[in-house]
Amino acid sequence: TATTDSDTTAPVIAEFTAVTTPTSDFTPNYTFSSNEAGTITYGGSSSCNSNTSSAFNGFTSITLISLRDGTYDNCTITVTDNSSNVSNILTLTSFLIDTTAPTVAEVTAVTDPTNDSTPNYTFSSNEAGTITYGGSSSCTSDNSSVISGNSLIVINSLRDGSYDNCTVTVTDSAENVSNTLTLTSFNVDSTAARLVEVTSVTNPTNDSTPDYTFSSSEDGTITYGGSCSSNTTSATTDNNTISLNSLSDDTYSDCTITVTD
């Protein structure tokens, strides 16, 4: 009498390595285990599929066929052994495909020129992510994260000079890197103008609108203090001659000038 072995035990399958989420890879890998070899069937409403049709006894890695951006929360796998026993239904852990890079744009440029060595800068991003600073001008910031919307950063201390190649990029959680945003060029000038008297008012003088000459290390706006004033409001680099407004006969010992660059 012939004896026929019967296999009525279905394979048991389990997730081993889920799809990275989020991921910018639209053909991601997935690994599962099976205690029997067999044929893989793909299902679920999320329409995941693969060209891998056979499962090993042990671990099987599959590469999913090209997926569009979106959330995949109902991809399933079953394994059918040689005796047509069908395994449990394995639902892949939900994952997100995101192949779209953030878009960043300048909102508020650094004031130019500025005497602030740690100036503010505002830009927008349509995704949250991690900021990377670059460019040959060596601008950096302790602000490392960006929100979806406008983000204000404080640039780390800068020396006086021109900054015309500071860049920002944003990398989202799926590792998509944004366009490179180059900050509008700006100048940091934290050094005040230096003034020196060149030609004092003749003393005494019978001129009620006497001239006065001073030098400035920078262009700027003149501010008068004390009892003296003038219609000249701008200073140039080097020597400047001003005519004081009409003065009464008297002694003038409190006349001051400052220049704001």
Regions found by a protein language model. Name each.
Residues 3, 31-33, 63, 94-96, ...:
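Generic structural detector for well-ordered beta-strands
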Residues 33-40, 124-131, 214-222:
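Short proline/glycine-enriched turn/loop motifs at strand-loop junctions of beta-rich domains
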